[in-house]
Amino acid sequence: MLSLFADQEREAKLDSLGDPLALLDKHVDFAALAAEIDRWAPWPSRAKGGRPPYPTELMTRLLVLQQLFNLSDEQMEFQLLDRMNFQRFAELKHSGRVPDRNTIWVFRERLVQANVEHQVFAEVQRQLQ
């Protein structure tokens, strides 16, 4: 059956079933974590130009999803396009642009190069306790 409110109805159903990503979003302060990441591993200079990076908070959410669901960069890109709860968690539900596999890799590599990738996940664990 066709419904103008299908997305809202699905979201309500996800919430009533206890979407674990909604709980994660409620208990982890991703904005504060993103600010810490920007302090630990600042973005490189954009003097050469190029497309502006996606927000650190969004990319952090994607790394957490990848870790939780054991997804490759390629699968993360696919799941972002396919799964409503991933889109909602990543705050991409109404976005026409989704980070691709290379963008996800570059962000993770930024953390690896700064040797802070494990700190990110340790902070998520700390906030969940």
Regions found by a protein language model. Give the residues of each.
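Charged, often Cys/His-bearing segments associated with DNA-binding zinc-finger transcription factors
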Residues: 1-39
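Secondary-structure capping and boundary motifs in well-ordered enzyme cores
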Residues: 13, 29, 50-58, 96-100
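Short, conserved catalytic/metal-binding motifs centered on acidic residues
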Residues: 19, 62, 76, 100-104
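Generic alpha-helical secondary-structure signal
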Residues: 36, 79, 106-107
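Short, Lys/Arg-enriched N-terminal segment that forms or immediately precedes the first helix
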Residues: 38-51
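Alpha-helical support elements that line or immediately flank enzyme active sites
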Residues: 58-70
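DNA-recognition alpha helix
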Residues: 75-87
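Active-site- or DNA-interface-adjacent structural scaffold in DNA-acting proteins
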Residues: 89-129
